[in-house]
Amino acid sequence: MTNIRKTHPLMKIVNSSFIDLPAPSNISSWWNFGSLLGICLILQILTGLFLAMHYTSDTMTAFSSVTHICRDVNYGWLIRYLHANGASMFFICLFLHVGRGLYYGSYMFMETWNIGVLLLFAVMATAFMGYVLPWGQMSFWGATVITNLLSAIPYIGTDLVEWIWGGFSVDKATLTRFFAFHFILPFIIAALAGVHLLFLHETGSNNPSGLSSDTDKIPFHPYYTIKDILGALILIMALSSLVLFSPDLLGDPDNYIPANPLNTPPHIKPEWYFLFAYAILRSIPNKLGGVLALVFSILVLALMPFLHTSKQRSMMFRPISQCLFWLLVADLFTLTWIGGQPVEHPFIIIGQLASILYFALILMLMPLASLMENNLLKW
């Protein structure tokens, strides 16, 4: 008798994706982040569902309802902090996952990569709207500042902003629609992640060497299931430590002050995972220019397959490209730091230089280094 997992219509899909999937024998721990992102998404959907049971999306009661969750709901504080810090873990895994893709040339799977870029935008939109929901000072002013950026779009900008707001300022209508979108988007993300996997399994996984691994495949289970479980345990331990020991470490104290349209906080800044993009936005004195730079700072990832000039796929055997890659990582840390600083000297000039370096590395220096390495191969 044939095994049920190979004949049952539903089990067959699970089997070909997670059990009998042929995987390269040499993929490292950098390939763990896909499964970790799946775990993060499931965690966010579950904790979010329980939070939504107690949350009210009304400007008068939103802040109080979050306080009520933390004080009165059984383990409400745990659910709330798991959700808030789960978002941080989600972004850490996302950045590492994208970084792995850049380093090992995974962007050469174009469909998978482009769905991934789309997923990144969707997760960023979801996180932004989620940050607005507690209706603290930073929620309100963050929503005001970021939505206002759309007014930089010529001709239709102002109308577009008022349409998104549902009025002439960020108010009840804005909060209600943000809650609705924040609830639905994770399910769209889950569907997109399914498409992401579908395209990945059309080609098979990349591996650290960047060479074809068709001659040396091993089944996903038990080798990589056990490896993913180890990664999951590390993720859960890190998240638990953060939630139970310092749940507010990555948050903003201003968000414990109820939203007040008459009082602007001294430093308006988003959550830490948006700071690099926020620094790029602020480094350009022109509003439209800043918005374009902000969007392009993420959209530039979609250009990666076209900017690949090397004869080798992976950076594993390309020392010059490796140096530039780690310079890019250092530059992103610098941008993240600058995004959290006030707009004053010397932070302005550091931010501008870091922004120029960011685009220069991706658009010019890395493709040029690859061409140089191609010539070194002839020696």
UniProtKB/Swiss-Prot annotation:
Disulfide bonds: none annotated. Heme b b562 binds at H83, H182. Coiled coil: none annotated. One of its GO terms (cellular component) is mitochondrial inner membrane. Heme b b566 binds at H97, H196. Its cofactor is heme b. Belongs to the cytochrome b family. This is Cytochrome b. It comes from Talpa europaea (European mole). The gene is MT-CYB.
